């Protein structure tokens, strides 16, 4: 079994296990994170893997490649991601936006040399962020409990299902040649991780409890993406509400040098 197949099967197994076997985990007081005991354990595991393997590779990657090259790599993968954005824009009935995103993809794939240069943004075509988790939210499916996925990081029950669906619109995952697929996948993961190196320093200074900080930031961002930055009706807002917790009442996070990165596969 190759790397991408192993990761895909591992994610499926993790989601199924979480959906069927975790109801008995120790509960905390936050209704949006009833699996907090389990999630903190996975968070600590992810952080350990990141500290031992991914972060050093990302640091070396940034040290070797100049900023202009890293920007080009990021643009390349962002352009491929527009395929997922277009599909989910259509599924959310955002036809004008999806048309604009299709224009972005065509322009950057041609004039922008396979996306290495973000020509479309210079021409006024805005970059959007859409995925199947947001599509489910658009059609009224609640986020469900917060979830930390092994290796993949912050998620929710809805977004975990959406992540699996997004595999089928991910251009990298559809490449038949295993060597190219794995090379591109690995490069994307490392490039994404390198972009978090500066952010994590701010997190370590600002957050008393890294786990709670990452969780709340993730949930707030996902609500904003589903809402497209607008307020929803009171019932929907209440469904995704995350009450503030006093820092003193939160259990200490597992010692770590950085939060586990959220990497889009």
What are these model-derived regions, one by one?
Residues 1-6:
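N-terminal secretory signal peptides that target proteins for export/translocation
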């Amino acid at each position: 079994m190759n790397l991408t197949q192993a990761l895909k099967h591992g994610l499926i197994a993790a989601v199924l296990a979480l959906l069927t076997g975790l109801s008995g985990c120790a509960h905390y007081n936050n209704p949006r994170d009833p699996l907090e005991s389990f999630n903190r354990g996975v968070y600590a595991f992810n952080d350990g893997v990141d500290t031992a393997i991914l972060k050093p590779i990302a640091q070396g990657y940034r040290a070797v490649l100049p900023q202009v090259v890293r920007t080009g790599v990021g643009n390349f993968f962002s352009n491929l991601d527009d395929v997922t954005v277009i599909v989910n824009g259509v599924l959310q009935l955002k036809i004008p936006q999806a048309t604009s995103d299709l224009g972005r993809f065509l322009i950057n794939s041609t004039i922008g040399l396979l996306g290495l240069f973000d020509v479309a943004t210079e021409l006024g075509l805005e970059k959007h962020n859409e995925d199947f988790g947001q599509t489910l939210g658009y059609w009224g499916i609640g986020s469900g409990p917060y979830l930390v996925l092994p290796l993949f990081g912050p998620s929710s029950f809805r977004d975990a299902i959406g992540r699996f669906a997004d595999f089928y619109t991910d251009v990298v995952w559809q490449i038949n040649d295993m060597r190219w697929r794995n090379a591109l996948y690995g490069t994307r993961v490392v490039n994404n991780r390198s972009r978090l190196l500066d952010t994590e320093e701010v997190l370590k200074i600002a957050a008393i409890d890294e786990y709670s900080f990452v969780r709340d930031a993730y949930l707030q961002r996902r609500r904003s993406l589903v809402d497209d930055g607008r307020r929803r009706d009171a019932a929907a807002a209440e469904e995704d509400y995350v009450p503030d917790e006093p820092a003193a009442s939160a259990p200490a996070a597992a010692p770590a040098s950085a939060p586990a990165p959220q990497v889009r596969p």
